[in-house]
C-alpha cells in the first residue's frame, strides 16, 4: 500500500475532508495534496511519527515498501532512431539494497547491446543522472530519441558505442552535443530478464 492510499483510506473510513485530514495531521493543505498526489513521499521523522499516531499504523514501513516499487517507464532502443516512450508499463518491487541503486526500469528493444548481455525485452534498471564516467552504459537522449549505449569521452568527442559489431559507433563534437542536443539521462545499473 502506498502513502496516498493509506491517507485516503483513513480519510474515507473516518468521513474526513482533505482539509480536516490535513488539520488532523498538522500540515498545510498544499502539503497534504502533494502527499495524496504522490509528489512527495520523503517525510521528516517527526512527521512520520505524527502520521503513525494519527493513522495508528507503522507509516515508516509503508514508506519503505513504497520506495521499493520502481516503475517500468516504457521502451528504449538498443539501436538508434526510436522515440522515448514514457508510458508506465507496470511496477517491479525490488529488495532494499537494489531499490536505492536506481529510479526506474526501461524495456529494451533492438540488439545493439547484445555484447553487453542486454537483449530484446530485457529490463534495464536506470539511475537518473546527467553525467556518467567514460565506458559506462547509459541512456542517452539524442534530440527526442532515447538509446542505450556505452558512452566514451575522447579528444573533445562524445562517442556512443554499441556492443554489437553490426552497429557503428557514433561520434559527436561538443558543438553537436549542444546543438542537437545530446543528453545523458541515466546510468544503467543492472539488467533484469524474465524467462516467461
Description of each model-found segment:
Residues 1-16, 20, 24:
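A short, Lys/Arg-rich alpha-helix, primarily the initiator
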Residues 15-16, 43-46:
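Residue-level signal for the short linker/turn that defines the boundary of a DNA-recognition helix
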Residues 107-113, 127-129, 141:
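A structural micro-motif recognizing beta-strand termini
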Residues 26-43, 64:
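Recognition helix of helix-turn-helix/homeodomain-like DNA-binding domains
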Residues 119-120, 129-196:
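C-terminal regulatory/effector modules of DNA-binding transcriptional regulators
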Residues 5, 46-49:
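Surface-exposed alpha-helical interface segments used for non-catalytic interactions
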Residues 46, 53-119, 134, 153, ...:
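Short, positionally conserved secondary-structure boundary motifs
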Amino acid at each position: 500500500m502506498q502513502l496516498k492510499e493509506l491517507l485516503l483510506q483513513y480519510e474515507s473510513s473516518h468521513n474526513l475532508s482533505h482539509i480536516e485530514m490535513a488539520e488532523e495531521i498538522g500540515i498545510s493543505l498544499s502539503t497534504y495534496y502533494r502527499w495524496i498526489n504522490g509528489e512527495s513521499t520523503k517525510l521528516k521523522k517527526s512527521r512520520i511519527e505524527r502520521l503513525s499516531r494519527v493513522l495508528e499504523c507503522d507509516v515508516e514501513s509503508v514508506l519503505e515498501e513504497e520506495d521499493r516499487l520502481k516503475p517500468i517507464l516504457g521502451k528504449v532502443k538498443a539501436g538508434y532512431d526510436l522515440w522515448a516512450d514514457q508510458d508506465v508499463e507496470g511496477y517491479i518491487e525490488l529488495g532494499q539494497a537494489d531499490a536505492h541503486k536506481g529510479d526506474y526500469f526501461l524495456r529494451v528493444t533492438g540488439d545493439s547491446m547484445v555484447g553487453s548481455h542486454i537483449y530484446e525485452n530485457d529490463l534495464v534498471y536506470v539511475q537518473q543522472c546527467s553525467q556518467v564516467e567514460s565506458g559506462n552504459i547509459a541512456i542517452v537522449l539524442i534530440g527526442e530519441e532515447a538509446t542505450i549505449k556505452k558512452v566514451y569521452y575522447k579528444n573533445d568527442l562524445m562517442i556512443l558505442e554499441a556492443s554489437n559489431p553490426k552497429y557503428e559507433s557514433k561520434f559527436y563534437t561538443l558543438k553537436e552535443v549542444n546543438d542537437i542536443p545530446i543528453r545523458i539521462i541515466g546510468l544503467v545499473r543492472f539488467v533484469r530478464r524474465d524467462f516467461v
